A protein has these predicted regions:
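Gram-negative bacterial Sec-dependent N-terminal signal peptides
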Residues: 2-33, 458-459
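Generic alpha-helical secondary structure signal
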Residues: 6-7, 21, 43-46, 241, ...
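General helical secondary-structure elements
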Residues: 7-9, 284, 462-465
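Sequence/structural signature of beta-propeller domains
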Residues: 34-444
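A short, hydrophobic C-terminal helix/tail in secreted or cell-surface proteins
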Residues: 447-466
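Short, charged juxtamembrane terminal tails flanking transmembrane helices
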Residues: 468-471
Length: 471
């Protein structure tokens, strides 16, 4: 993912299986079920795939050769259909609740004229399934990165762009992401109670507190606690609330593990806190300088966030730190910070410490069984997706294995998202390729009966199966 800093830019539902042949559709009811995924059944890849060695429409070497991949949207096609699309497709979210839950994917454009698009997974027409909802440059939106579905049924994104004197670093809510038909009727609202930072990861805990980060060398981790955590709309949720910066072992330190406390950087209503909050010229709060005043613990380019819920109900917040090649875990029940993955973690392919083979961890994703995936911010030929094993769920991984490797020249993989209604489907974007043709790729584990048909030589382009909500 690109790292946008003001003035300077630093680099930083349908289950479809890819084969050839006819479209088979099987309608069925959605139902809740315990999840079991086939994505953890693989032999770790020993090395990267060579840059440019695979077609852009199927750019990944996958660690299990039975898994399939198919392009479900690409930018060149969108432009040919007259859709405004500035490219650099970034993080992915789906409509996880409400009517037609799981039907749509949403993603922002991480460009100087950013926007938001939606992919309809139930639309078989490749030319019409993807629609731009927020036109590039709306409200001066730049560097769209964050992507999250809210508990009340809307879509959040935010700007990965912040610096002293900036007007960016804002959080936005698309309040009608499912019902909007395009740019003409979408409702895109800035939520100004959130302090300005260089946004990437967003996550809600079970109490509906919202976590976010400042992607910066020396960036902090934050928690927003709404005065109305059970709000049924964003107007009420973001009306008033307090933001805190994480302190580990007392704060005022770097890359720390140990005891967690939360230091306020705003008052209870989201306004300035005397002696702590730093105001921008427009009256908004500078989250970065305010966290420094509150002695928030600094991490080195914290990027994506994920929350995992354990069987006992405890929740662990994970954060990737790109500069230090680490992933941290923060147990929100015990208030303990740990190092989840670093250079000393064992590589499943060699049995030795992974060292600098794992480089620039950026995105995180969690599958239906709670397994963690780490996506590198690297160019094609070096960009890998890693599977992390934490068998005892203590927040410290025992090993990592290379799960996929991407070949597309000039690109990086981003936004890995596991379908909440089918544990054997995932989506990932191929961002800023040299060709300029960003893509969304669907990766799938064939169901046993489907795989048998493949072995028998029967062809499928798509297979719509019963959608099962994952618990």
């Amino acid at each position: 993912m690109y790292y946008f800093q003001e003035i300077h830019i630093f680099k930083k539902k349908t289950l479809a299986f890819l084969v050839s042949g006819a479209l088979i559709t099987m309608a069925g009811t959605m139902q809740a079920s315990a999840a079991s995924t086939g994505f953890d059944n693989f032999t770790a890849l020993p090395s990267n795939i060579a840059a440019g060695s695979l077609p852009e429409s199927s750019p990944f070497q996958l660690a299990n050769p039975s898994w399939t991949q198919v392009s479900i949207a690409n930018r060149t096609n969108q432009l040919s259909q007259g859709q405004a699309n500035s490219g650099n497709w970034d993080m992915i979210a789906a409509n996880e609740t409400g009517t037609d839950a799981g039907r749509y994917l949403f993603m922002p454009f991480e460009t100087g004229d950013a926007g938001v698009q939606r992919i309809d997974l139930l639309n078989p027409d490749y030319n019409t399934r993807t629609v731009t909802l927020v036109a590039p440059g709306t409200q001066g939106f730049v560097a769209g990165d964050a992507s999250l579905w809210t508990p009340w049924g809307s879509y959040l994104t935010a700007e990965e762009s912040w610096g002293a004197g900036s007007t960016k670093g804002r959080l936005f809510e698309l309040t009608n992401p499912v019902t909007a038909t395009g740019t003409g009727d979408s409702n895109f609202v800035q939520r100004s109670v959130i302090p300005h930072v260089s946004h990437e990861g967003l996550a809600f805990d079970k109490d509906n507190s919202m976590y976010f980060i400042d992607e910066f060398n020396g960036g902090s981790i934050y928690k927003y606690v709404s005065a109305n955590p059970n709000a049924t709309n964003g107007d009420d949720y973001f009306a008033t609330g307090q933001t805190f910066a994480m302190q580990v072992n007392g704060g005022g330190n770097d890359n720390a593990t140990g005891a967690i406390t939360w230091a306020p950087i705003t008052d209870a209503n989201g306004g300035a806190l005397a002696g702590v909050s730093v105001l921008n010229s427009d009256g908004s709060i500078d989250g970065r300088l305010s966290a420094d005043n509150a002695l928030g613990t600094n991490y080195q380019r914290p990027e994506d966030l994920e929350i995992k819920t354990l069987d006992n109900g405890d929740q662990i917040l994970f954060a990737a730190t790109t500069t230090t090649d680490e992933v941290y875990s923060f147990n929100l029940a015990s208030n303990t910070a740990s190092l989840f993955v670093n250079a000393s973690t064992i590589d499943q392919a060699t049995g030795l410490a992974v060292g600098d083979v794992l480089n620039n961890p950026d995105n995180l994703a969690i599958d239906a069984e709670g397994n963690m995936y780490i996506i590198e911010d690297q160019p094609g030929g070096q960009a890998d997706i890693w599977f992390a094993t934490d068998a005892n769920n203590d927040g410290v991984a025992e090993s990592v294995g290379r799960w996929a490797s991407m070949s597309t020249d000039g690109a990086e993989p981003t936004g890995l998202y596991f379908d909440k209604f089918n544990p054997n489907v995932a989506y990932v974007n191929v961002q800023h390729p040299s060709s300029g043709d960003d893509r969304t790729i669907m990766i799938a584990v064939p169901e046993p009966e489907t795989y048998a048909m493949l072995l028998a030589g029967l062809g499928l382009i798509g297979f719509s199966a019963r959608r099962r909500k994952i618990r």
